[in-house]
Amino acid sequence: FVNGGEDLEKAILHAVTGWKNGGACFVPKSCGQIINYVSAHDNFTLWDKLVLSLHQEKADFDRHYEDVYAANKLAAFIYFTCQGNLFLQAGEEFGRTKQGEDNSYCSTPELNMIRWHRTVEYGELVEYYKGLISLRKCLPGLCDKSPDAAARITCGRIHGEGVVSFLVDNQDVRPSLWEELFIVYNASSEEQRIEMPEQGG
């Protein structure tokens, strides 16, 4: 979706509810049974996946590509705003690379090590992830793991290729900063004007 995949809008809207509303060959009892992630230790890092898919033959994993940076941020925003549990690969928040190696468990320590200097080089991305973590803590509508949590997500809409939106009921027993959230994912290359729907509309 974030790197140009087509016809994934429905799947993205299903992912938002932790697949509780269907769309897969299974229906979890609650979104608490779902782990949301975009990279793991035994696959490509997110950064490497994006560099390979967006730049293919000319892939330079140490280069700061603006389109890869933007796609990384959108991927993080998407899974931080989905119901379910979050999982991050160590270093994802600063564009960790394993130089395109997808299964590095037998690779050298030099390839697998965390390159801490990237926390400075990609400091803006680190701050973005910190912001998402802080924001997530303020969103009971997305952190709800109950069997009824999916009912908090309404008005899921597809607005064209790479663009979806939905409303989140963010009310809680404790006062919340926002009672309702309107979330839009725009993976297209164009700015979009999206009307906020009426609740229940």
Tell what function each PLM region has.
Residues 102-105, 197-199:
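Short, glycine/charged-enriched secondary-structure capping and boundary segments
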Residues 187-200:
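Surface-exposed beta-strand/loop patches in extracellular or lumenal glycoproteins
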Residues 1-90, 94, 103-105, 170-176, ...:
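Conserved alpha/beta catalytic core and glycan-binding cleft of carbohydrate-active enzymes
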Residues 72, 81-101, 111-181:
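Glycan-recognition and catalytic regions of carbohydrate-active enzymes
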Residues 1, 51, 127, 141-145, ...:
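A broad, low-specificity signal for short, low-complexity segments enriched in glycine/proline
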Residues 108:
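Catalytic or ion-translocation cores adjacent to nucleophile or general acid/base/metal-coordination motifs
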Residues 35-37, 112, 164, 192:
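A broad, low-specificity signal marking well-ordered, structured residues that form hydrophobic/aromatic
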